[in-house]
């Protein structure tokens, strides 16, 4: 049942998701494409986690955070992709109010966690390159755990702000969401609350997270660049660049799409463009991250070669 009478209002108990397209042929094609992307994402990120766990040479803070980033990428994609794949095969794509709440919270939680982890990894690179003699002290196991716990707490608090924005919304009629998942912006557009006040907590917290994490990343890489330019050894420069370029590529891809969604004025792009960009950072980027880190990082490539050689000759 999609509606429930409540006094003078008709409460919505489920939502209908528009998805990406109504074309039945295109839906089958997209199902195959996104299924392949999801399988590559899960296998690639789980392989990254396993490689870091079994390779003693990767037991460093940078790869400790990278393994958690890989876990987040699997979780990020899994909040959206399975439901999206099912919807491609259904004539009418629905999600319950509770399911929508869970998807909204989960997406905000892992998305925020990714921001904090990327910022933490930038700080780790800053300490490693700019203060190498203090690295073992400033990035001790205890400090790494504290940074990780802080990231999870930050993710939980920001996701909670999304619920504070979502729960006051009244849905008294239409229940068709112009999106492939439960995203806050189209839900607010669908609401009959008639006020922009509910979106304030989520907007404020999201802006705070983006400003803080981008500032940490920008300041860290400014000092890193200055330090690298002062290096006299060409080999030292190349090693420093090799450990930073993969992370910087991941940061650029992720924050580029997040900025498009949350910073650019809504009037500058359509809802369909919003959906395409959202697919990129929730589905495509999590698949690309393990590829970026394996292709651009010499330590990852070296560890992978050693593990493969060990398997072949064992």
Curated annotation (Swiss-Prot):
SUPFAM superfamilies, per the entry: Family A G protein-coupled receptor-like
Matches recorded under PROSITE patterns: G_PROTEIN_RECEP_F1_1, G_PROTEIN_RECEP_F1_2
GO molecular function (one): olfactory receptor activity
UniProt keyword annotation of Transmembrane present: yes
Carbohydrate-modified residues: 8
Keyword 4Fe-4S part of the UniProt annotation: no
Compartments where located: Cell membrane
Residue ranges crossing the lipid bilayer per the database entry: 29-49, 58-78, 103-123, 137-157, 200-220, 241-261, 275-295
Keywords for the protein's UniProt record, in alphabetical order: Cell membrane, Disulfide bond, G-protein coupled receptor, Glycoprotein, Membrane, Olfaction, Receptor, Sensory transduction, Transducer, Transmembrane, Transmembrane helix
Pfam families xref list: 7tm_4 (PF13853)
Cytoplasmic face of the membrane: 50-57, 124-136, 221-240, 296-314
Cited InterPro entries: GPCR_Rhodpsn, GPCR_Rhodpsn_7TM, Olfact_rcpt
Membrane-topology annotation of the record: Multi-pass membrane protein
Function statement: Potential odorant receptor.
Protein name as catalogued: Olfactory receptor 5P51
Gene: Or5p51
């Amino acid at each position: 049942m999609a509606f429930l009478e409540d006094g003078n209002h008709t409460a919505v108990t489920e939502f209908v998701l528009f998805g990406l397209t109504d074309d039945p042929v295109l839906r089958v094609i997209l199902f195959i494409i996104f299924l392949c992307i999801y399988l590559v994402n899960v296998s690639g990120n789980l392989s990254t986690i396993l490689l870091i766990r079994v390779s003693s040479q990767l037991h460093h803070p940078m790869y400790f955070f990278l393994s958690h980033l890989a876990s987040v990428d699997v979780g990020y994609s899994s909040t959206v992709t399975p439901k999206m794949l099912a919807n491609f095969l259904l004539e009418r794509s629905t999600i319950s109010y509770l399911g929508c709440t869970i998807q909204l919270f989960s997406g905000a939680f892992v998305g925020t966690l990714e921001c904090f982890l990327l910022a933490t990894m930038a700080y780790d690179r800053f300490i490693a390159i700019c203060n190498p003699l203090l690295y073992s002290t400033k990035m001790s196991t205890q400090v790494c755990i504290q940074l990780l716990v802080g990231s999870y707490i930050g993710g939980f608090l920001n996701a909670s702000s999304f619920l504070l924005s979502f729960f006051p919304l009244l849905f008294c009629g239409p229940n068709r969401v112009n999106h492939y998942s439960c995203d806050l912006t189209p839900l607010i557009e669908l609401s009959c609350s008639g006020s922009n006040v509910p979106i304030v907590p989520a907007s404020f917290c999201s802006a705070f997270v983006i400003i803080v994490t981008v500032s940490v990343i920008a300041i860290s890489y400014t000092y890193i660049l200055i330090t690298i330019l002062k290096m006299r050894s060409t080999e030292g420069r190349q090693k420093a660049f090799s450990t930073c370029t993969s992370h910087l590529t991941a940061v650029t891809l992720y924050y580029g799409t997040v900025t498009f969604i949350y910073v650019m004025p809504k009037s500058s792009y359509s809802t369909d463009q919003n959906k395409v960009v959202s697919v990129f950072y929730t589905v495509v980027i999590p698949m690309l991250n393990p590829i970026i880190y394996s292709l651009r990082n010499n330590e990852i490539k070296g560890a992978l070669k050693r593990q493969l050689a060990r398997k072949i000759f064992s």
